[in-house]
C-alpha cells in the first residue's frame, strides 16, 4: 500500500473516532416515585431559556431532531403520545460550551514536550420527565460529550442527537412505559 493511501486511511479512521468521542450518560429518578404508573406523555411548555449559542437557539432543525428522537425512543419503550391528560410532560434542554483540554496536564509526572492545550465544543442534552398532575420532576437523563465539528454539520449532528437521546432513554427504569 502506498504511503499516501495509508495516511488517508489513518486520517479517516481518526476522523471517524472523533465522531464517536466519549459521551457520558447519567440519570436519576426522584425518590418515592412509582415510575411504573406512567404510560402516556405530551410535550411540556417550550423551553424559553436560551443557550447563548446561535447554532442552538431558535434552531428548528435541531429542535425537531431532538423531539423526533425522544418520541421514537419513548414509543419503542411502550409510551403513547397523548393529546389530552398525559401522565408525563417531556422537556429538554441543550447547551454548548467551549472547554479546554490541556493535553497531558492530567498526567503531571509524565514528560511531554508536545503537550498543548486545545479548545473544543462540549455539548449537553438534558431530558426531563415531569409528572403532569403534580408538575414534579420524576426522572432526568442527560448526555455530555465533545461535539467538535458535529454541531456545524447537519448530518453528523442528527446522528449524534439520535445516539445521545437513545442512550439517555435507555436509562429509564425497568417497567416505565410498558403495560404491566
What are these regions (language model features)?
Residues 21-36, 120-124, 131-180:
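C-terminal/domain-edge helix-coil "capping" segments
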Residues 14-17:
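Bacterial Sec-type N-terminal signal peptides, specifically the leucine/valine-rich hydrophobic h-region
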Residues 48-50, 95-99, 134, 144-148:
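Solvent-exposed loop/turn segments at secondary-structure junctions
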Residues 23-24, 77, 87-138:
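Surface-exposed short loop/turn segments
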Residues 35, 54, 58-66, 82, ...:
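Extracytoplasmic/periplasmic, Sec-exported soluble proteins
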Residues 2-3, 7, 20-69, 76, ...:
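A structural "domain/chain start" motif
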Residues 66, 70-81, 94, 129, ...:
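Sec/Tat-exported extracytoplasmic proteins
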